[in-house]
Amino acid sequence: THVKISHDIDHSRTVYVNGRQIVRTGDMMWMNWKKPGPSAPGPKGGPKTGLGKGVDGVAAKSPTLQKDLADLQKDGWNIEYGPKGGGSSANRATKTIVLDGNLQSNPNAATQVLSHEVGHAKYPYTADMSSKASYVNGTLADEGAATMKNIQVQREITAAGGPDIGIAGNSANHASYNNAYNQYLKDGNAAAARQSIGTTFGKGEITSTTGQPYADYYGGWYDKVKGGKK
């Protein structure tokens, strides 16, 4: 599936998940370029995923994911499958997480995507347009936060005897992502871990359209919108 790339600065983020890409549109993260349809009410009365018994069973092995799901649902977030090929998204504006309908038959992959999207949903991202460096670093830190959540959930699930849901992104970068997360476990510096993962992401994840590292890609967008201002 190819990602439709906009030249609008609001369309500013992409991450690979199971060979597909997630793009940011303002506060919304979505796979492919099709926006999902209207959201249905999320599950009530407990930290269920709303994505079926298979995903519930895998997600139940991660205390962190269970708590985050409960918190998000209490805060009014809805979680559901969208159309097949419609993409996966975390929309902060509408408090909606939608997973691509193609993931319904793969609970492990669905849980991986869910953990990543929950990471975005829980991270208080705001675009910082004060400078090129601030903007790029902010977008990549958001990816760092989502990746950290993915790793935390992955480890909790495997520690509880569940399947390895894997980590979103280029597999060549996973060692670096894990190293940054391990350092965070030692020193508790989440900001540094987000920055480290974001730096690797910015250099090591490549756009499918321009062949650029994402740090250069986002920086180019900033330059275009700001007229080259730093």
Model region roles, listed by residue range:
Residues P47-E80:
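A metal-dependent hydrolase signature that marks the N-terminal structural subdomain at the beginning
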Residues V58, L103-S115, Y135-E143:
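Solvent-exposed, acidic/flexible segments
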Residues E156-K230:
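Long, well-structured alpha-helical subdomains associated
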Residues T111-Y125:
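Active-site recognition of the HExxH zinc-binding catalytic motif
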Residues D100, K122-N137:
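Substrate-binding clefts and substrate-entry loops adjacent to catalytic sites
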Residues T1-P47:
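Intrinsically disordered, low-complexity proline/glycine-rich segments
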Residues A133-A168:
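Post-HExxH zinc-binding segment in Zn-dependent metallohydrolases
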Residues A70-V98, L103-N108:
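Catalytic zinc-binding patch centered on the HExxH motif and its immediate surroundings
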